[in-house]
UniProtKB/Swiss-Prot annotation:
It is found in: Secreted. PROSITE patterns: HBGF_FGF. Its main location: secreted. GO terms for biological process: positive regulation of cell population proliferation; positive regulation of cold-induced thermogenesis; positive regulation of D-glucose import; positive regulation of ERK1 and ERK2 cascade; positive regulation of MAPKKK cascade by fibroblast growth factor receptor signaling pathway. Interacts (via C-terminus) with KLB; this interaction is direct. Interacts with FGFR4. This is Fibroblast growth factor 21. Residues 1-28 form the signal peptide. Stimulates glucose uptake in differentiated adipocytes via the induction of glucose transporter SLC2A1/GLUT1 expression (but not SLC2A4/GLUT4 expression). Activity probably requires the presence of KLB. Regulates systemic glucose homeostasis and insulin sensitivity. Most abundantly expressed in the liver, also expressed in the thymus at lower levels. Expressed in skeletal muscle (at protein level). Secreted in plasma (at protein level). Keywords: Growth factor, Secreted, Signal. One of its GO terms (cellular component) is cytosol. Induction: In the liver, down-regulated in postprandial conditions. Up-regulated at the transcriptional level by CREB3L3. It comes from Mus musculus (Mouse). The lineage of its organism: Eukaryota, Metazoa, Chordata, Craniata, Vertebrata.
Length: 210
């Protein structure tokens, strides 16, 4: 009788062990959701145009040029396409795609584009507003991101108020139409030769030619 209890106990231990192994395998079969706060925008890198109409001479897009100057452009351009990358929760870096320069800010508030990333000068806090606009502020200096103004270039930066920017989606590589290339036509399902394997290829895309 004692032998029977011992055997039953051993069998129960093996059943529990096998059940634990099975449940562990099922758990590992499912991907663990990434709860990193750096992915709050669906990805660490966003491609955007930063547009502002706050307290500027004209409506403008933030533009980083290859010589390192930062200006406001009335229209979108390759120089105004930016990459916004999360560094930590609420803090980002801004890179001009064409110029390959990081947006940075001096202690006096002046903006410039640097070929090298300086965590102190090139890190910005990003505050999301309810109206869809964002406010950016230097993490090190606490000064708001603001495009240079022609009428008051020497204005005291400490008197600047927050400027709203509207992040407008942009593509790193805009699709371009290829001249002289026609997309392939769908097969004619009503034909006895829907894939044109027998009939001569007349007026079809060159991609169908052998």
């Amino acid at each position: 009788m004692e032998w029977m209890r011992s055997r039953v106990g051993t069998l129960g231990l093996w059943v529990r062990l096998l059940l634990a192994v099975f449940l562990l395998g099922v758990y590992q079969a499912y991907p663990i959701p990434d709860s990193s706060p750096l992915l709050q925008f669906g990805g660490q890198v966003r491609q955007r145009y930063l547009y502002t109409d706050d307290d500027q001479d004209t409506e403008a897009h933030l533009e980083i040029r290859e010589d390192g100057t930062v200006v406001g452009a009335a229209h979108r351009s390759p120089e105004s396409l930016l990459e916004l990358k999360a560094l930590k929760p609420g803090v980002i870096q801004i890179l001009g795609v064409k110029a390959s320069r990081f947006l940075c800010q001096q202690p006096d508030g002046a903006l410039y584009g640097s070929p090298h990333f300086d965590p102190e000068a090139c890190s910005f806090r990003e505050l999301l507003l309810e109206d869809g606009y964002n406010v950016y502020q230097s993490e090190a200096h606490g000064l708001p991101l603001r495009l240079p103004q022609k009428d008051s270039p020497n204005q005291d930066a400490t008197s600047w108020g927050p400027v709203r920017f509207l992040p407008m989606p942009g593509l790193l590589h805009e699709p371009q139409d290829q001249a002289g290339f026609l997309p392939p036509e769908p097969p004619d399902v009503g034909s006895s030769d829907p894939l044109s394997m027998v009939e001569p290829l007349q007026g079809r895309s060159p991609s169908y030619a052998s």
